[in-house]
Amino acid sequence: MLKKHEKFYYGGDYNPEQWDESVWKEDMRLMKKAGVNYVSINIFSWARLQPDEETYDFSTLDKIMDMLAENGIGADLATATAAPPAWLSRKYPDSLPVDKDGSRFLPGSRQHYCPNSKDYARLAAKLVRKIAERYKSHPALVMWHVNNEYGCHISECYCDNCKKGFQTWLKEKYGTIENLNKSWSTDFWSQRYYEWEEICLPGKTPTFANPMQQLDYKAFMDDSLLALYKMERDILKTYTPDVPVMTNLMGLHKPVDGFHWAKEMDLVTWDAYPDPFEDIPYAQFMAHDLTRSLKKQPFLLMEQAAGAVNWRAQNAVKAPGVMRLWSYEAAAHGADGIMFFQWRASQGGAEKFHSGMVPHSGDEESRNFREVVQLGNELKNLEKVTGSAYASDVAIVFDWKNWWALELDSKPSSLVTYIKQLLPFYRVLHTQNIGVDFIHPDEAMDRYKVVFAPASYRVTKTFADKVKAYVENGGYFATNFFSGIADENERVYLGGYPGAYRDILGIYVEEFAPMKKGAVHQIRTGYGDAAIRVWEEKIHLKGAEALAWFKDGYLAGSPAVTAHHCGKGKAYYIGTQPDEQYLSSLLKEILKEADVRPALDAPRGVEVAVRKNGHEKFLFLLNHTDQVQFVDAGGTYPELIYGRTEAETVRLSPRDVKILQVIEK
């Protein structure tokens, strides 16, 4: 995956330019003590590298790169384009982005550039070329890091450059203005266009903007950011074709289509910042699986906090053992490296209260640094794990374009949001220790025994046909309410809901009945009554059988959850948002029927995850509780972290982790 990738990577963002050179020597000593072998540098250094448009100064970066090489530490060398210098904004004010109200953003923080600014792109390209020329053969160079967290702060711009770019993008997509009018349903509200130049960005309008205009604009902005990444990547590849190139994604980050971007990267990395106030941050765990799934290969955890962050309203610190536990959680789900932001906590600037691997005190005996040292030295034992695959028989469909479409305005209920619909399914599977891949609608489904597609509102005919073939050939498929409703042009499938899925599911939904916020109703199930929220609907059986029934109001007695035998497989439909206890029982039943089982039985709160490398299997056992737990491993196996053979009954201390190495015969 990485250049000379023979070990598990460990380190963090290193910003020595913020410190006097007298501190650097101490940094090298502490890095060696902590087992650091890899650092990200130069991410926010443009202003130092280029004091004006004609002048470049690489003297400090030269020293940093040489120092890393001398100490055997690899460099993830960034292109420094994430924060343009003040002189650029002053000289080229139209490089600054514009918000929906028409106000231009000011410099003074970061990411203050319009994705379609020709001046920004020209100057960024020139800088990247100089960096690539200078360091292409440097012994410290391991990987290129393009920009930083695209779309984190500025994912949309409403300037004239973007307006013209959007018009050009639309011409390329649709070919003719009539094709656009048809796709956008412009005969509604007298929105028909006759010239491309008539089309505006979906900015501030009296009421709801055209839905397809909004969706195309989101895709255009995603493409615009990706074009900047590809520009830098192509320059780097010209000088170093064999050095991996990536940028750090942000997991469940709505503006940037991860599947779209992953095709353009040599490996995928992401920045994870779970909230320590959550006992088990399932959304972050889900993002690990999503990130790995973007290329179906190991990823790097490029940033996490050693303790607290600084940008929430209340910034909890990670309790003793939590940083270590959550780091191994990333490794269990496919990470081949664990990195932090940042190495040394900053003395000044906006993130000075964001924890570092080295705290403000510099105290080697602080809990913060002792945990950093412990983890770094333990990870040296994971070389065998690097490059191994994550084992999963179950997939969840994830589609950014569907996410964008589902959460547009003017839908039946604003309570129906994408991640909130996916997360209960993921959480149930995680607690049952069922490995999960995420798949794009264009990917093959056949290798999975079960495929879940919650909240799949936007469905192409091609995908619906693929699902039907999958089920007919023996697959198990499950979706829920408000799915199969609209096509890729945001046009409703006629003939009755759930549109594209009607035949597969064997049902007809006559009408939606969204629930009031906070309302709780009941359904009758084979496991007893269960609470439901958010949504009800009138379902008619057209070949399916009912598994649960609504109990309240005019829907009382009508089906709420259904199953439909279709060919050799089965398709399930959940017409409401049930409580997690019922969802867990239902999913367990589906998994059992599809012959999907966890690798080991474990007590609640103990996670079992599997990575495989040929006949070698690595069982990660993670205790997410504050109690001692025991797991029957079914045999005695070598344990990688502690370097000893574990008894058949494995003892896990509170928040402890063990990794069993199993050779399959």
From Swiss-Prot:
One of its GO terms (biological process) is galactose metabolic process. The active site is at E149 (proton donor), E303 (nucleophile). One of its GO terms (molecular function) is beta-galactosidase activity. Its EC number is 3.2.1.23. CDD domains: A4_beta-galactosidase_middle_domain (cd03143). SUPFAM superfamilies: (Trans)glycosidases, Class I glutamine amidotransferase-like. It catalyses: Hydrolysis of terminal non-reducing beta-D-galactose residues in beta-D-galactosides. It holds the Pfam family Glyco_hydro_42C. Zn(2+) binds at C114, C157, C159, C162. This is Beta-galactosidase LacZ. The lineage of its organism: Bacteria, Bacillati, Bacillota, Bacilli, Bacillales.
